[in-house]
């Protein structure tokens, strides 16, 4: 069923491997994004963005010998340059720098067996820990992780920090930066569409779809773009901002620019009109905003 629903070939995945994968509507729009892990023979876990994906799967499960259930998991993120050292301590040495990007498995963390992947929502070196619903002693896990991280200066942070880092890193938010009215190509995610695989939902529409992107980055030295801000070309509105934040890394205001039509937008200086009516010069750039070779998240900058 996952080969039918997701845009990448799932049946050939190795155990412990993770893929970023999209689910599309029949018309080729982006319905859901997430990471699918192969837990074992015929066992998979799709870590989805917000939305009714389980209902979608159940509706499409007719004719498949499949069991679909929500594990009621909550995800903890250990992200940053010291994350390998922290997880090494938390796992009693079982997790180290040899664990590749987008690999996963079960590990003992303070006496609890939990699923861990070398992924994250920050485009930073890091790990995600998947709690097992009511079976996990969350308080004990929290105390164990904080004790492992204390010698490395680990701190608890909010989703605001996560949002800033994910936008800096070019990670899109489903229904915020992309939605069912956009194809993966328009969202700049064409690399995750395998048109060579057998039929999947949306494939026929995507074969004939325009391959040009409508989504880019925007930088502004004078202001921070916010959701709903307009992008003007010679006083004509040509796009809008889906999400924006101040970037500590770049020292600029940054945001995702969604254009109404394809065009040669990159490297163009345009006008950003904020909701308060003020207008500021801005530049359109390719995503991500930095580390375009993804060396940090792969640990290749160490």
Q: Language-model features: where?
A:
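Conserved, structured C-terminal
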Residues: 36-302
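Extended, compositionally biased flexible segments
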Residues: 1-43, 47-63
């Amino acid at each position: 069923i996952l080969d039918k629903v997701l845009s990448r070939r799932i049946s050939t995945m190795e155990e412990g491997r993770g893929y970023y994968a999209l689910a599309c509507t029949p018309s080729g729009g982006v319905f859901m994004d997430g990471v699918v892990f192969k837990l074992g023979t015929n066992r998979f876990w799709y870590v989805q963005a917000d939305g009714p994906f389980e209902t979608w799967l159940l509706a499409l499960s007719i004719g498949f010998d499949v069991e679909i259930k929500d594990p009621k998991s909550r995800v903890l993120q250990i992200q940053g340059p010291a994350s390998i050292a922290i997880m090494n301590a938390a796992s009693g040495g079982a997790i180290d720098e040899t664990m590749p990007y987008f690999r996963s498995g079960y590990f003992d963390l303070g006496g609890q067996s939990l699923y861990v992947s070398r992924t994250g929502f920050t485009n930073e070196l890091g790990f995600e820990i998947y709690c097992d619903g009511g079976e996990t002693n969350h308080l004990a896990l929290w105390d164990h992780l904080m004790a492992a991280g204390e010698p490395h200066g680990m701190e608890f942070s909010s989703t605001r920090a996560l949002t800033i880092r994910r936008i800096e890193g070019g990670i899109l938010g489903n229904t915020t930066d992309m939605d069912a009215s956009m194809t993966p190509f328009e969202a700049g995610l064409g690399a995750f569409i395998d048109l060579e695989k057998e039929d999947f939902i949306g494939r026929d529409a995507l074969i004939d779809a325009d391959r040009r992107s409508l989504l880019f980055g925007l930088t502004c030295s004078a202001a921070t773009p916010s959701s709903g801000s307009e992008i003007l070309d010679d006083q004509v509105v040509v796009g809008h901002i889906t999400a924006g934040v101040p970037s500590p890394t770049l020292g600029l205001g940054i945001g995702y620019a969604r254009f109404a039509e394809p065009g040669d937008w990159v490297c163009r200086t345009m006008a950003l009109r904020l909701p308060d009516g003020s207008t500021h010069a801005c530049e359109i750039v390719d995503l991500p905003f930095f580390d375009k070779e993804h060396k940090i998240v792969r640990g290749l900058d160490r």
